[in-house]
Amino acid sequence: MISNIKIGIAAGALAVAAFSVTQPEEKLTESTQEVRIPESIDRGSPPSLQMYKYIKMYADTFNIPLRYAFGIANAETSYKGPFHWNYNPAQTSCANAVGPMQVMVSTARWINKDNVSKDFLRTNIKYNVYTSMKLLRKLYNKRGDWRVVFGEYNTGRPCINGYAHKVYNYKLDWKKP
């Protein structure tokens, strides 16, 4: 009887091992490789939710008004809030600014005192948003006027332009689908 139990346990263990549910291999397309960033937040979170989380977190950290922080994201990469399910943050501008907040690599290196790669800055939402909010705070501390800050964020020199007015007047009026 004991040997029958041992055989039954061994057969049961073999069946469990054979029929265990494992995670299927994730099929990556070119667009998901750019957007799904494991070190940013859990792999299952859409980029729009990652953006929402990190903008709120770092705007609070650097004391940036939320509507301005979200206004920059909207002006730079057309971010439309947490329900913007097809949002692609891994964009590159014609001027070579990268990522969701369109930060230049040289600016990121200067602000963060590191040697960040263009690809990391472009694809890591957390790092890109952090860099953007840190830059906005530094510019505001120097200039004292949000419109001038937004103009400088956009052009690299202190000014008030159409972009500055767009961000300054941005309204949080997202619609849930």
Name every feature range the model reports, one short phrase each.
Residues 1-13:
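N-terminal Sec-pathway targeting helices
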Residues 4-7, 19-20, 114:
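Extended, non-core accessory segments
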Residues 17-26:
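Short hydrophobic alpha-helical membrane-entry/anchor segments
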Residues 25-177:
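Catalytic glycan-binding domains that act on GlcNAc-containing polysaccharides
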